[in-house]
Amino acid sequence: MRIAAIINERAGTVACLSPPVVAARLSAIWTSLGHQAHVTLAEGKDMGRAIRKACRDPAVHAVIIGGGDGSLSRSLKHVVGSGKSLGVLPLGTMNYVARQFGVPFDLDRAAVALADAVPTPTDLGRVNDRFFLIRACLGAFPEFIRSRDEARRKGGSFLDGALAGLTGLARGHRLIEAELIGPDVQARIATSFFMVSNNMCRDSDPFQLERERMDGATLGVYIGQGAGPFSLMDLGLQVAMGRWASNEALIRGSLPWLEIRTRQRKPLVSIDGEVEKMEAPFRFDILPGVLPMLVPK
């Protein structure tokens, strides 16, 4: 197998070990296992350019992204339809995708596992023209993420970031007032929390956000009940206990597609942990089996 690995050189693990050392280790492991590997260190827009180049190379069989969930998510627009398999080296903060597919968190073990992994058809979510592997959120959660990331960029710890996010929510946040349209569904909502996941979430550790499966061809839709600070606090406590499927503070359902018409023209949206403003209205779809994901045996 010919591997093109694109590594985010700003990822914490890479910075600690030294980027050239990481590249040399990965290349040596894959070569020793009989594969041809080209490892590229990049950051920012250069990562996108390197991924696009690898996806257009007819000799490449697999593209492996070393970074967090956001780096992986941004690669999807290049990988989907390219005929390449996609793998992940978990070098980010939460690493939800790596957890979901059983990729080891140790760098060397992850490289070995991916060398022998099986390309497995995997569903993708899509909101407008943006793919996602995990979830897309509107309401309080994107505002929490934005405040958290600002604190982290200023040198704060993970805990500092979380506290900054909670402080920001305590000062107030925008409600999502919207009309929902789906198969046999039409409703108006006013909520602090709105999430659409790639397949349904199961009750588990909240820091894993584990889905029941990744080939169920459905979107999971989760809407917080109520719109005030107390309802948001109740929801947060339930989620902190790992309750998604049994969370009484959530209305949940599964749909193949959903349209959302919000009063805000460009609300904040969190897509696989990355926050951006997106033009409303929103169209969510599930794309069954479009991504060949490298899944360890």
Curated annotation (Swiss-Prot):
Binding site for ATP: 68-74
Domain DAGKc: residue ranges: 1-131
Induction: Part of the probable 18 gene mamAB operon.
PROSITE patterns in the cross-refs: DAGK (PS50146)
Keyword annotations of the record: ATP-binding, Cytoplasm, Kinase, Lipid biosynthesis, Lipid metabolism, Nucleotide-binding, Phospholipid biosynthesis, Phospholipid metabolism, Transferase
Transmembrane annotation, as ranges: none
SUPFAM superfamilies per UniProt: NAD kinase/diacylglycerol kinase-like
Miscellaneous section: This bacteria makes up to 20 cubo-octahedral magnetosomes of about 45 nm in diameter which contain membrane-bound crystals of magnetite (Fe(3)O(4)). Expression of just the minimal mamAB gene cluster (amb0961 to amb0978), including this gene, is sufficient to form a minimal magnetosome chain with small magnetite particles.
Name assigned to this protein: Putative lipid kinase MamU
Organism name: Paramagnetospirillum magneticum (strain ATCC 700264 / AMB-1)
